[in-house]
């Protein structure tokens, strides 16, 4: 049997073909898995469980079919869907995990996280993250009318896009470094959690990295995004494989 890991699908009404690909994945591949882990950014944006969305409803229904069949599905909130709450999770049969967390995977402790906590060189983002993860901020935001939340989310997205565009027009190497994980934080994270395997998403740079941390040989697996194709990590007792999924 195999455990499946995905992240950064960024499901959005503007890209229905990716939602269709995910629904097909849930129907055709996930039912034979031991478990499914979604490590954040399942959705492009999430401003509350009460937001009307036929696509999100279809995803919840498909996930519930999967979990009702006996395949557990776990979710770690990402930087795009950190407001996804227990109401939607119940509808989808998802079990929300803390970010980060350690699980036992075929006899091996493995650290899971979305991945944005590793990008410590992006100081403005880390400040924004700290603000928006504050329970008081979230309660106040979710208490606003839907129209106000939509306007806030649109403004935040425009600000983020403008900042990234400005950074790209500058030193490309600096942009790549700032938006990727910080090596020192990766090392510290391995040591802090006492593991030698880490799985995360967020950076959209799928790869399997071998490194040394705290005097131990470690493996950092980065999941891919679903903008052009699907990306899935398959793990079993013998190892792991990072695969792509065609939209065809």
Swiss-Prot record:
GO molecular function, a single term: manganese ion binding
Main location: membrane
Highest taxon of the lineage: Bacteria
Pfam families attached to this UniProt entry: Metallophos
Coiled-coil portions: none
A Gene Ontology BP annotation from the UniProt entry: lipid A biosynthetic process
Cofactor mode of binding and number, as noted: Binds 2 Mn(2+) ions per subunit in a binuclear metal center.
Broad EC category: hydrolase
Known catalytic reactions: UDP-2-N,3-O-bis[(3R)-3-hydroxytetradecanoyl]-alpha-D-glucosamine + H2O = 2-N,3-O-bis[(3R)-3-hydroxytetradecanoyl]-alpha-D-glucosaminyl 1-phosphate + UMP + 2 H(+)
Cofactor(s) required, per the database record: Mn(2+)
Residue sites binding Mn(2+) 2 per the record: 41, 79, 114, 202
Entry's Gene Ontology cellular component terms: cytoplasm; extrinsic component of plasma membrane
Transmembrane annotation, as ranges: none
InterPro entries reported in the protein's UniProt record: Calcineurin-like_PHP_ApaH, LpxH-like, Metallo-depent_PP-like, UDP-diacylglucosamine_Hdrlase
Gene3D superfamilies: 3.60.21.10
Residues at which substrate binds: 79-80, 122, 160, 171, 202
Topological relation to the membrane, as annotated: Peripheral membrane protein
EC annotation from Swiss-Prot or TrEMBL: 3.6.1.54
CDD domains: MPP_YbbF-LpxH
Location of the protein in the cell: Cell inner membrane
List of residues binding Mn(2+) 1: 8, 10, 41, 204
Pathway stated in the Swiss-Prot or TrEMBL entry: Glycolipid biosynthesis; lipid IV(A) biosynthesis; lipid IV(A) from (3R)-3-hydroxytetradecanoyl-[acyl-carrier-protein] and UDP-N-acetyl-alpha-D-glucosamine: step 4/6
HAMAP family recorded: LpxH
Function text: Hydrolyzes the pyrophosphate bond of UDP-2,3-diacylglucosamine to yield 2,3-diacylglucosamine 1-phosphate (lipid X) and UMP by catalyzing the attack of water at the alpha-P atom. Involved in the biosynthesis of lipid A, a phosphorylated glycolipid that anchors the lipopolysaccharide to the outer membrane of the cell.
Full protein name: UDP-2,3-diacylglucosamine hydrolase
Organism: Stenotrophomonas maltophilia (strain R551-3)
Record lineage: Bacteria, Pseudomonadati, Pseudomonadota, Gammaproteobacteria, Lysobacterales
């Amino acid at each position: 049997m195999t455990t499946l890991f995905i992240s950064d699908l960024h499901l959005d009404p503007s890209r229905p073909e990716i939602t269709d690909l995910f629904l097909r994945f849930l129907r055709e591949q996930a039912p034979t898995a031991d478990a499914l882990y979604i490590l954040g950014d399942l959705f492009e944006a999430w401003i509350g469980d009460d937001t009307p969305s036929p696509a999100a409803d279809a995803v919840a229904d498909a996930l519930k079919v999967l979990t009702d069949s006996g395949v557990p599905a776990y979710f770690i909130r990402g930087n795009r869907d950190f407001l996804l709450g227990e109401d939607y999770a119940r509808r989808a049969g998802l079990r929300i995990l803390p970010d980060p967390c350690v699980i036992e995977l075929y006899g091996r402790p493995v650290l899971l996280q979305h991945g944005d906590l590793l990008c410590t060189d992006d100081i403005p983002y880390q400040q924004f993250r700290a603000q928006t993860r504050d329970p008081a901020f979230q309660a106040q935001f979710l208490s606003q009318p839907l129209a106000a939340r939509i306007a806030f989310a649109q403004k935040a997205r425009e600000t983020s896009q403008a900042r990234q565009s400005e950074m790209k027009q500058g030193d490309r190497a600096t942009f790549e470094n700032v938006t990727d994980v910080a090596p020192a934080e990766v090392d510290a994270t391995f040591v802090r959690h006492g593991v030698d395997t880490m799985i995360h998403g967020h950076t959209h740079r799928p790869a399997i990295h071998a490194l040394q941390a705290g005097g131990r040989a470690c493996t950092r697996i980065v999941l891919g995004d679903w903008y052009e194709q699907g990306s899935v990590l398959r793990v079993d007792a013998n190892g792991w494989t990072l695969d792509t999924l065609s939209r065809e």
